[in-house]
Amino acid sequence: MAREPQRLRRRERKNISSGVAHVNATFNNTMITITDAQGNAIAWSSAGMMGFKGSRKSTPYAAQVCAEDAGKKAAEHGVRTLEVEVKGPGAGRESALRALQAVGFHITSIRDVTPIPHNGVRPAKRRRV
């Protein structure tokens, strides 16, 4: 018996004018999620999703390509203005922000939401290379 082909469900196009761009820039990767005001994800991308592997994921260029991809997906849903929340110490922080501006979004605010410990857990030992 032949199996019937699976139907691809096309996501319905939301009509959202403003959103929040969450930029998570770690030392190893850059992940960007664009959500609505309630936190429901509209579009997302990461340097690894864009085909960068290994140490290339942590470059500013990878973050730029990733931000352009997420921005284009969000623009299809009608997003025009963005608040940007940047988290982490990675190299892709500023380049992702510039790429979102270059896509054509009006950025209303930029917040740094990097978690800072109040002397939490012991840090990892120093690397000896």
From Swiss-Prot:
Keywords: Ribonucleoprotein, Ribosomal protein, RNA-binding, rRNA-binding. InterPro entries: Ribosomal_uS11, Ribosomal_uS11_bac-type, Ribosomal_uS11_CS, Ribosomal_uS11_sf. GO terms for molecular function: rRNA binding; structural constituent of ribosome. Pfam families: Ribosomal_S11. GO terms for biological process: translation. It comes from the Bacteria. PANTHER family: 40S RIBOSOMAL PROTEIN S14/30S RIBOSOMAL PROTEIN S11 (PTHR11759). Belongs to the universal ribosomal protein uS11 family. NCBIfam families: PRK05309.1, uS11_bact. This is Small ribosomal subunit protein uS11. The gene is rpsK.
